[in-house]
């Protein structure tokens, strides 16, 4: 199951990594992490043959598993120039795919998901992969996870109209935050916590599901 056959085989997975290289992902540690995680484990069985396409796929409950390029791009922004992501918070764990990639690059991942059924899927997937350095919590991601902060890296998998203040408060000095922002047109925001304050760089146009409050 982990190695896959046919459209989920190692060869198919290797082609996905080559596509990421062609699209501009240069960080070898990020590419290695993407190659290490079997994406087909995280998608519905009916979609397994599409698991290594560079596209977002539906998870149910109005949510998606993110496009591999976008996952790699966001993690590369967090990692570049560092040997590790350090203590990392993921907002919007979904089925756990991105958390599993993050877990290849640090020993300390905290991931929150507001939808209980998706969180249970993520927990089951972590058990399948024996990925024991991911702590999953049912929580409102806009509030972060203050009891576990501050964080060296924060990554958000849903777009709000603004940057949630709680996430800035939980970003450690020297920390990095990457998230989509925008209620209509969205862009990728990269924020660094410098001695002079928070410095934001606006990057690629993106499309994510909305960042919602509360839990279900």
From Swiss-Prot:
Its EC number is 2.1.1.77. This is Protein-L-isoaspartate O-methyltransferase. It catalyses: [protein]-L-isoaspartate + S-adenosyl-L-methionine = [protein]-L-isoaspartate alpha-methyl ester + S-adenosyl-L-homocysteine. Catalyzes the methyl esterification of L-isoaspartyl residues in peptides and proteins that result from spontaneous decomposition of normal L-aspartyl and L-asparaginyl residues. It plays a role in the repair and/or degradation of damaged proteins. GO terms for biological process: methylation; protein modification process; protein repair. Signal peptide: none annotated. Keywords: Cytoplasm, Methyltransferase, S-adenosyl-L-methionine, Transferase. Coiled coil: none annotated. NCBIfam families: pimt, PRK00312.1. It is found in: Cytoplasm. The keyword Transferase applies. Belongs to the methyltransferase superfamily. L-isoaspartyl/D-aspartyl protein methyltransferase family. The keyword Cytoplasm applies. It holds the Pfam family PCMT. The active site is at 66. InterPro entries: PCMT, SAM-dependent_MTases_sf. GO terms for molecular function: protein-L-isoaspartate (D-aspartate) O-methyltransferase activity.
């Amino acid at each position: 199951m982990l190695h896959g056959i046919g459209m989920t085989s190692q060869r198919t997975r290797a082609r996905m990594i080559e596509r990421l290289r062609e699209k501009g992902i240069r960080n070898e540690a990020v590419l290695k992490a993407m190659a290490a995680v079997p994406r087909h484990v995280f998608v519905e069985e009916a979609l397994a043959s599409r698991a290594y396409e560079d596209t977002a796929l539906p998870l149910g409950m109005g949510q998606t598993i993110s496009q591999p390029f976008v996952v790699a791009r966001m993690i590369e922004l967090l990692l570049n120039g560092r040997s590790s992501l350090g203590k990392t918070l993921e907002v919007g764990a979904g089925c756990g795919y991105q958390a599993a990639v993050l877990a290849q690059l640090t020993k300390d991942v905290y991931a929150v998901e507001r939808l209980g059924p998706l969180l249970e899927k993520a927990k089951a997937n972590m058990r399948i992969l024996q990925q024991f350095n991911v702590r999953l919590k049912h929580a409102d991601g806009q509030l972060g996870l203050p009891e576990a902060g501050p964080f060296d890296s924060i990554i958000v998998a849903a777009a709000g109209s603004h940057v949630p203040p709680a996430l800035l408060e939980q970003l450690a000095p020297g920390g990095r935050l990457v998230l989509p922002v925008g209620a209509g047109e969205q862009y990728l925001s990269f924020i660094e916590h410098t001695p002079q304050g928070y410095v934001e760089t606006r990057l690629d146009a993106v499309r994510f599901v909305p960042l919602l409050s509360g839990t279900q």
